[in-house]
């Protein structure tokens, strides 16, 4: 069974049990995820959202198919009261363009809640609003529309956290025990709550709770092993003008939303998750959600980091991939670390195209189990179901056509369909694939390695240096009228041509000669498919002796 379906089943069982025991008022599975809008959130952060989305989608299917009579919600929280801990090297504007941050004077906002830091581009009310907008727009581009978005800043103002804040003061001794067990570097009287200083706007450690207010002195605090400067202000603020520290805020969110299921990365498993379970049960009197730990993945062999600047957000990757292909990447087993190598992204696309063929019965997996898995993986990542198998242009071929023909590439695809006398490639899908594969070539193929047709003068020099047997085959090939044939027919003609020569070893030399005459390289795209896009005069001039 697909991993998301297994988790969906667990969530349904949990809801049924909680409802029967009177712990919840309605049978509703709450699938939750969240992010801190600290900058451009990369595709590794998408793990939270997409893993949760697949489980949500599986439960939704159960409801639509009348397999369960409950409800399901998909909730995302923006942890916008988290402090600005460091300045990302690059930040993205609302037009999805990256900018250097070094000259923007943002250091003065370190230690302030993200919801109180100004938007560096002046387009939104705050830093957090800006980067949450960029993040959510990327998610919607994937076809994920059902997500309810909540902001911690609003939840604090509305008093949603009050019950949990008061609980940590009422159970100070128990909190101290938990601190000793999980946070050895903290002192015995440590209180996991910070006030927002009304004078300088930074988060500051507090002294005590007095009814619904907290006393504090703004002496700064340590963030990521760095001390932020406080202004020295002494006073009181309402508890709604503060923030639970992460280990205590996360379990409080579980309680606020009655969270049934939540995925998280392995970094939280060893720390926050283990302490969070204790805090949930012993401080807040709630049960933690069903957990799901996923492994991080690398991009180009490296871990992404906003502070280092090697970040790829959803919008970046959707320049080179269709949304369904990117979603497919997240269907793979989450406990295994994977490396998304952008220079070889065609491998992922080819894999998706093959899974699509398996879904529509045009191909089979190596085993029955693999076939069933492939069908389910495809089904859960596709947002639009087709009435028949989509006829997609192969990615590498699309890249080749885009590099050589540019905007006229779609015309070559249409000519190919016309020659074949049938629709080999769907027009709308071909336009999208040509755009994505063309962007990929421009962004990730070094200029010297991109494909282009060499000029006649260079081709003539290469032709003169060829073996006479190869020249003879090329002359015959040029006279075969292949310009009127489909790619499949051209492949057959080449096979017949080599066979008629009586020397099978000429096959490699023939293909190599064709690539050299076309591109000045011994390798290239599938030859027959590309020749199918060429006109008669070009073929004769390039392959036939004058």
Outline where the language-model segments fall.
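Basic, alpha-helical terminal appendages of large translation-related enzymes
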Residues: 1-26, 41, 64-69, 73-75, ...
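N-terminal Rossmann-like or analogous alpha/beta NTP/dinucleotide-binding catalytic cores
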Residues: 1-176, 276-278
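Short, conserved helix/loop micro-motifs enriched in His/Cys and acidic residues
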Residues: 32-39, 251-258, 492
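Short, solvent-exposed loop/turn and secondary-structure capping segments
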Residues: 43, 85-87, 180, 207-209, ...
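Active-site cores that bind ATP or allylic diphosphates and position pyrophosphate for catalysis
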Residues: 145-315
């Amino acid at each position: 069974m697909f991993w998301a379906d297994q988790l969906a089943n667990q969530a349904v069982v949990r809801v049924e049990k909680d409802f029967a025991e009177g712990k919840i008022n309605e049978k509703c599975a709450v699938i939750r995820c969240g992010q801190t809008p600290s900058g451009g959130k990369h595709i590794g952060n998408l793990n939270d959202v997409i893993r949760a989305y697949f489980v949500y989608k599986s439960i939704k299917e159960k409801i639509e198919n009348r397999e369960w009579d409950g409800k399901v919600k998909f909730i995302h929280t923006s942890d916008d009261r988290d402090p600005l801990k460091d300045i990302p090297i690059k930040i993205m504007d609302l037009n999805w363009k990256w900018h250097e941050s070094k000259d923007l004077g943002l250091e003065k906002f370190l230690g302030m809640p993200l919801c109180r830091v100004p938007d560096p581009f002046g387009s939104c009310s705050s830093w957090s609003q800006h980067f949450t907008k960029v993040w959510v727009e990327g998610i919607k581009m994937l076809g994920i529309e059902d997500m309810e978005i909540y902001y911690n800043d609003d939840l604090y103002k509305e008093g949603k956290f009050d019950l949990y804040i008061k609980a940590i003061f009422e159970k100070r001794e128990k909190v101290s025990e938990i601190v000793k067990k999980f946070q050895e570097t903290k002192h015995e009287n440590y209180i996991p709550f910070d006030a927002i200083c009304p004078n300088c706007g930074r988060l500051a450690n507090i002294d005590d709770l007095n009814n619904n207010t907290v006393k504090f002195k703004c002496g700064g605090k340590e963030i990521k092993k760095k001390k932020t400067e406080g202004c020295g202000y002494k006073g009181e603020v309402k508890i709604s003008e503060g923030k639970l520290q992460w280990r205590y805020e996360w379990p409080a969110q579980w309680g606020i939303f009655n969270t049934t299921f939540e995925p998280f990365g392995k970094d939280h498993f060893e720390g926050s998750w283990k302490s969070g379970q204790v805090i949930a049960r012993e401080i807040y009197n709630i049960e933690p959600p069903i957990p799901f730990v996923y492994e991080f993945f690398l991009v180009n062999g490296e871990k992404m980091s906003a502070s280092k600047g090697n970040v790829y957000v959803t919008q970046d990757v959707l320049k080179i991939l269709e949304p369904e292909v990117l979603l497919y990447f997240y269907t793979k087993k989450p406990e295994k670390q994977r490396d998304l190598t952008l220079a070889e992204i065609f491998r992922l696309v080819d894999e998706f195209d093959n899974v699509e063929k398996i879904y529509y019965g045009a191909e089979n997996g190596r085993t029955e189990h693999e076939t069933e898995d492939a069908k389910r993986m495809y089904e859960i990542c596709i947002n639009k179901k087709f009435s028949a198998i989509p006829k997609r242009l192969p990615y590498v071929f699309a890249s080749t056509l885009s590099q050589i023909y540019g905007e006229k590439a779609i015309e070559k695809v249409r000519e190919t369909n016309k020659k074949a006398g049938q629709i080999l490639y769907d027009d709308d899908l071909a336009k999208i694939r040509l755009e994505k594969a063309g962007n990929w070539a421009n962004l990730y193929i070094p200029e010297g390695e991109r494909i282009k047709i060499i000029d006649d003068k260079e081709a003539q020099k290469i032709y003169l240096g060829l073996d006479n047997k190869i020249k003879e085959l090329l002359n015959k090939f040029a006279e075969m009228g292949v310009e009127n044939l489909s790619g499949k027919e051209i492949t057959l003609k080449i096979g017949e041509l080599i066979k008629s020569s009586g020397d099978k070893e000429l096959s490699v030399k023939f293909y190599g000669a064709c690539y050299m005459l076309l591109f000045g390289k011994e390798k290239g795209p599938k030859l027959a498919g590309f020749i199918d896009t060429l006109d008669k005069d070009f073929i004769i001039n390039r392959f036939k002796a004058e």
